[in-house]
Amino acid sequence: MSISESPKKHPVLLIAGPTASGKSQLAIAMGIKTNGIIINADASQLYTDLQILTARPSDADEKILPHRLFGIQDGSEPASAVFWAELAKKEIKNAHESGRLPILVGGTGLYIRTLLEGIAPIPDIAPELREEVRSMSVEEAYSALQQEDPMAADRLRPTDKTRIMRALEVMRSTGHPLHYWQQKKTGGIANEIKLQSFVIIPPANILRSRCDKRFDQMLEQGAEKEVIRLMGRQLPADLPIMRAIGVREIASYIRGEIDRLTMIEKAKAATRQYAKRQRTWFRHQTDESWIKIFDDINFKKIDDFAIKLLSI
């Protein structure tokens, strides 16, 4: 994820960070300075159904600069990192062909990693084996993983059910540990572009305050009506759109299961917890080539960033 010196490679700007960190504002400011096109790299913002609750760009924002891959996927159709990465590659290519700078903006680390590093060519898991593994308790699965793939077990928390099950089913299905396949990733674009990455990591107390303020603003903008419309579609509860932050809490309030104050408290807590996980991920998963922004962004810094970017 470092800047390449090859003159044949086109530049790509990546602005990452947790929810409510100020990514969109920085992206627009940088895009104005660099003739950019903003490309969504946030899983929730792909979906058409939730503009307010996922903090998609406003109509005013989209009039300032072109925005791509926002609100393009119906909520009934779950998206994946691979699906998004293929679309992002096309949008990056289109931006370069039109003489503009592609600016990736988002907080979904898996999406970003898949685009840059590619995917591991893991063979399909037989449904019977998958069902067998996923019927185990997390304790049973972790114990089995410690025996069959101790390296994976050492990397995972004993309560991380999803990743434990995945590592165990891959080991049992292919006879190779997960890290074997991860070393064979293909399709990433990191070596084909000149990448400059920024990650915004506000202080924890400021991020918590921003999360709370943002949810209040979402309610003022009509988040409840948005969830009522979504509930009217009667989509399966396990779809990503139904698990978006705030949907479950607002839906519980609408059904009369909790009062309004409890709904607000629960939704804010869920937002803060999500932002905390993202903040931790970006602090530990990014290397020294990323420019880390820990404080408020001012116009002088934006000018400096733009000059640096245009010089690579």
UniProtKB/Swiss-Prot annotation:
For substrate, which residues are the binding ones?
T19, A20, S21, G22, K23, S24
Q: Which reaction does it catalyse?
A: adenosine(37) in tRNA + dimethylallyl diphosphate = N(6)-dimethylallyladenosine(37) in tRNA + diphosphate
* Enzyme Commission number, as recorded: 2.5.1.75
- List the coiled-coil residues: none
* Stored Gene3D superfamilies: 1.10.20.140, P-loop containing nucleotide triphosphate hydrolases
- Could you tell me the superkingdom of the organism this chain comes from? Bacteria
Instruction: Write the record's keywords in alphabetical order, separated by commas.
Output: ATP-binding, Magnesium, Nucleotide-binding, Transferase, tRNA processing
Q: Can you tell me which residues bind ATP?
A: G17, P18, T19, A20, S21, G22, K23, S24
Q: Which family does it belong to?
A: Belongs to the IPP transferase family.
| Known function | Catalyzes the transfer of a dimethylallyl group onto the adenine at position 37 in tRNAs that read codons beginning with uridine, leading to the formation of N6-(dimethylallyl)adenosine (i(6)A).
Supply the name of the protein: tRNA dimethylallyltransferase
